[in-house]
Amino acid sequence: MAKKIVGFIKLQVPAGKANPSPPIGPALGQRGLNIMEFCKAFNAQTQGVEPGLPLPVVITAFADKSFTFIIKTPPATTLIKKAIKLEKGSSNALSTKVGKITRAQLEEIAKTKLKDMNAANVDAAVRTLAGSARSMGVTVEGL
């Protein structure tokens, strides 16, 4: 018989840097899950990823206090900022432009993110990412 699911917990955790401090500790503790077990398993699975890169993770909590988790790809905005070596987006995206990104760079990001996006193909994913870039105050070239 399948285990009874009692809830889902969505967090953004830096790769390889999961520890019991907030936000992880309180979120898992409320459901009675073993915090250190999650931290060790998460850090082990994210060894090959750039340390500190924020990764969305969905934790499924079961009635017997066990859990499973799925690690998703980094947020699009993080990948865009990394691609154009930007610290943060524009505070006023319409008037203040903070950088430029090319279609080729967006295609690279789209290939990485495609499995987590609801886009039919790479071209649709590129257009979605271009919208995210524009809302950050980044000029999109070649689209």
UniProtKB/Swiss-Prot annotation:
UniProt modification remark: One or more lysine residues are methylated.
Keywords: Methylation, Ribonucleoprotein, Ribosomal protein, RNA-binding, rRNA-binding
Family annotation (CDD domains): Ribosomal_L11
Protein name, UniProt field: Large ribosomal subunit protein uL11
Pfam families for the chain: Ribosomal_L11, Ribosomal_L11_N
Keyword rRNA-binding recorded: yes
Subunit structure comment from the entry: Part of the ribosomal stalk of the 50S ribosomal subunit. Interacts with L10 and the large rRNA to form the base of the stalk. L10 forms an elongated spine to which L12 dimers bind in a sequential fashion forming a multimeric L10(L12)X complex.
Disulfide bonds: none
Gene that encodes the chain: rplK
GO biological process, one term: translation
GO CC, one annotated term: cytosolic large ribosomal subunit
Molecular functions (GO terms): large ribosomal subunit rRNA binding; structural constituent of ribosome
Function summary: Forms part of the ribosomal stalk which helps the ribosome interact with GTP-bound translation factors.
Family affiliation: Belongs to the universal ribosomal protein uL11 family.
